[in-house]
Curated annotation (Swiss-Prot):
This is NADH-quinone oxidoreductase subunit I. It is a peripheral membrane protein. InterPro entries: 4Fe4S_Fe-S-bd, 4Fe4S_Fe_S_CS, NADH_quinone_OxRdtase_chainI. GO terms for biological process: aerobic respiration. Binds 2 [4Fe-4S] clusters per subunit. It is found in: Cell inner membrane. Its main location: membrane. [4Fe-4S] cluster 2 binds at C72, C102, C105, C108. Its cofactor is [4Fe-4S] cluster. [4Fe-4S] cluster 1 binds at C62, C65, C68, C112. The gene is nuoI. NDH-1 is composed of 14 different subunits. Subunits NuoA, H, J, K, L, M, N constitute the membrane sector of the complex. GO terms for molecular function: 4 iron, 4 sulfur cluster binding; iron ion binding; NADH:ubiquinone reductase (non-electrogenic) activity; quinone binding. Keywords: 4Fe-4S, Cell inner membrane, Cell membrane, Iron, Iron-sulfur, Membrane, Metal-binding, NAD, Quinone, Repeat, Translocase, Ubiquinone.
Amino acid sequence: MKLDQVARSLLLKEFVSGFVLAMKYFFKPKATINYPFEMGHRGPRFRGEHALRRYPNGEERCIACKLCEAICPAQAITIEAGPRRNDGTRRTTRYDIDMVKCIYCGMCQEACPVDAIVEGPNFEFSVETREELLYDKQKLLENGDRWEREIARNIAVDAPYR
């Protein structure tokens, strides 16, 4: 037994096996990206910052059905509906999302019958105060206007699987 230990230490078996393993990984392609300068791929089902969408004519899509508010497990969505219009439709007077409470589960997006509320492609929305994470209707509509092209493309790509 002692002779075996002497042979191992003289031949540096552990060192050589560790060195071989390190060299194997040293020459493989890198698995990480240089984040601020390179962006990783985000699939069409990526769930990022929330947005309210509009129809091509500029009218907001939300019909104040409150399904998203009812299905939200975190109770992060608050909606107030206005009175019915002459054409029988309703629109929201207040649409708030508390992004601190939101768990980004996507259930609001799945429940919406008109694809009004979506989780967009943006994941870089750090803020300095908690109040900035209380999104009102105007902020959500601005997000929708900003990301509409990419949101529409993601919905079109994902449509066969819905």
